[in-house]
């Protein structure tokens, strides 16, 4: 996901993460920080282990491009209020990515009710091989993603001056 939005990131653009994130939802955003000048902002949990929603709201600004948070913590088991996270993010024009690696296998998930732009999960949590996963995205959100690798069946036409990509 971070690679998919990288071309839209300008120095000073913000990515908001929670302190509950698995490193797989931290390291890619650090790449954007290192390579493109993105600013990572961190939101803590409250005394119950829930995402501190007041701190989340305070962390958001008109420079926030992405709120990337766990839907269910792999350490605490906390389920975040994804619909409220989306509402707050929308108020500043930010997109929402939910890490569904835990929730996708432990609870019923309705991505439309959650109103997230993207929902990701890993294949090994559903007895698939390591290194694969699934991505849900709203059509308009997926259309904003840019390819970060090329080849094979993703290419429609290759010419000297341009490349046309197949529909996702």
Where do the PLM segments sit?
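Pyridoxal 5′-phosphate
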Residues: 1-168
